[in-house]
Structure formats: C-alpha cells, structure tokens
Amino acid sequence: MTTGAGRRLMLVAVVLATAAGCASYSAELRAGKRGEREAGLATYYSPRLAGHKTASGERYDPKQFTAAHPVIPFGTHVQVTRTDGTNRAVIVRVNDRCKGGRKIIDVSESAARQLDMLRVGIVPVELEVMAPPP
C-alpha cells in the first residue's frame, strides 16, 4: 500500500519529468522565431487519417503541405530537410501536434512524397523556421 508521502513523491517525480521534457524546446522555437533549427526524425501521417481533425481544428488533407510538431505555433512555415545525404527539402505549415522526443515532426503525405520518404517511413531531418505564424 502506498502512503500519502509516497504518492506525493511519485506525483512530484512525474511533474518534474514532464517539465524536463518540455524544457528541451527553446523559447525561440516555441515562439516560431525565424531561423530557429531542430534536428531529429520525421515520419508521415497514415492515409487513414485523411479528413480527421487536427489539433488546430483543420481537417487533415494529405494533398496539402502540412505537419505536426510538439511546440511550434500553428501557422508557422518550416523547412524540413533530409540529413541522410539526399538533401531533399520541403516547406510545410504546422497545423497539428505530435508527441516529440526523437521524432520531431509528422508530415503530410504530399510532403513525405516530396521528401522521398514514403517507402522508408522515417528519416533524419533538420527543421528550420522560415516564417512565423501570421
């Protein structure tokens, strides 16, 4: 049986772990400041999600160049560049949220096609904020 003090300690540990994860994003990236960069892995949306609502309230359209990111503001335009030697790049507009971690962005099917990642599913990328939200 867990004591009251044990429960409080567990709650504090969860809060600190969550805060530490959130703190890894700079204030500039959170604000969508032009020129901010981030490196990690990209994946793309399943075709089954077409028509589902995104976190911004828009419907996911696989034909649009959109993406999900944990903290970059909705409406921000971001260049996504593969860093595995292909240097393929695409500019997307953030309109959804994803969990983060090593996987930093989920892109639409059209953006994934432009990045030539449909067969592999996950690729290393660098993001650069191109234009802050309007």
Predicted features by range, described:
Residues 10-20:
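Bacterial N-terminal signal peptides
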